């Protein structure tokens, strides 16, 4: 056994028996290789593992060198928002539909993971967004996002009137169904479906993509990731929310603003040595093929 990674966490929320089988196979293989393994508590319960080290996501982040997330992109996003707070590397085995963030093929996962554990991997730092719903005399409500923060109506779809300030300078106003504020990681997710640009992961940029704007002149905007975005709203409005990675929703009350900025920490995402972002675009999203 090498010394690139000593303690490995197994993470995920299995929805299908095949995913649970992958968790069990991974656990037994890592133990046979001599690694210290920490299993997320829910997985250990599902597998009926006895007398094995278990932990929460936070405990895995504190104790392990590498977290292996088994599942789809949703599982990866949910785990990564917590794991990013810690100095831990993260890689994924795809057991979902698209698997844009989960690189390892479940049929060849052990061989690919073996190469990674021997130090043959590519490391990337992916920044997160922090979203705050705030008012002067109220406590802030805060969440984070790997992909995007989305402004949208709370229950029934309707048009929203709002203003956007960038670094406290008025940028534009809009009447639309909402706004997608995306990281480069999220530029191939919801933002892409709304007509936003694809940003390569290394770019220090944030995109603002309108959702069904009531004007022909509204276009996506790309700004520096060091900028702070403030959203202000008309007082005459129905319930609004912001959602983070389509997994966490924060309600917006009357008189409250939304502040969105880059997080102070980042996700350490690793890939197999032969990983290519543009190849992933081609295979996962049907990006155009080579002509010759």
Curated annotation (Swiss-Prot):
UniProt catalytic activity: NAD(+) + ATP = ADP + NADP(+) + H(+)
Subcellular location: Cytoplasm
Pfam families to which the protein is assigned, alphabetical: NAD_kinase, NAD_kinase_C
Enzymatic class: transferase
GO CC annotation, single: cytoplasm
Gene Ontology BP annotations: NAD metabolic process; NADP biosynthetic process
Protein known as: NAD kinase
Protein's organism: Salmonella dublin (strain CT_02021853)
